[in-house]
């Protein structure tokens, strides 16, 4: 199924979370539409490089530092939405990714999708447990 994703018309989003086998990730990149990972600034050069090679949105969540998305070598950055009182971070990244993917699928606007993801993640931070 993975290897038919680009030709079958459905979109594939994968959250690699903290997985760091870059050779394996690159092997899968041609079949994905949304490549998402949680990480740090040091990952950015690798994902910019991958975005120049594969037709996929590469999104790196940097927690309170916001997020970065690469598409065809172009970089997009959005700051995290400030939250006065953080109750629980459980599910925050998942909420961000859901908002990002849904917004992009509806609007086809990378920066807007990143802002929507950040807003939904900020709301999740205000509640106990995955929200």
Regions found by a protein language model. Give the residues of each.
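Conserved phosphate-binding/catalytic region of the ribokinase-like
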Residues: 47-131
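Conserved phosphate/ATP/ADP-binding segment of small-molecule kinases
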Residues: 6-77
């Amino acid at each position: 199924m993975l290897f038919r994703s680009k030709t079958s018309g459905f979109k594939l989003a994968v959250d690699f979370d903290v997985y760091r086998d870059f050779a394996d990730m690159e092997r899968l990149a041609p079949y994905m539409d949304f490549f998402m990972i949680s990480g740090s600034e040091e990952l950015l050069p690798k994902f910019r490089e991958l975005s120049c090679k594969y037709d996929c949105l590469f999104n790196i969540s940097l927690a309170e530092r916001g997020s970065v998305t690469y598409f065809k070598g172009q970089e997009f950055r959005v700051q995290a939405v400030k939250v006065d009182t953080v109750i629980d971070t459980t599910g925050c990244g998942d909420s961000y990714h859901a908002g990002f993917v849904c917004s992009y699928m509806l609007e086809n606007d990378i920066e807007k999708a990143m802002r929507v993801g950040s807003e939904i993640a900020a709301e999740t931070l205000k509640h106990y447990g995955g929200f």
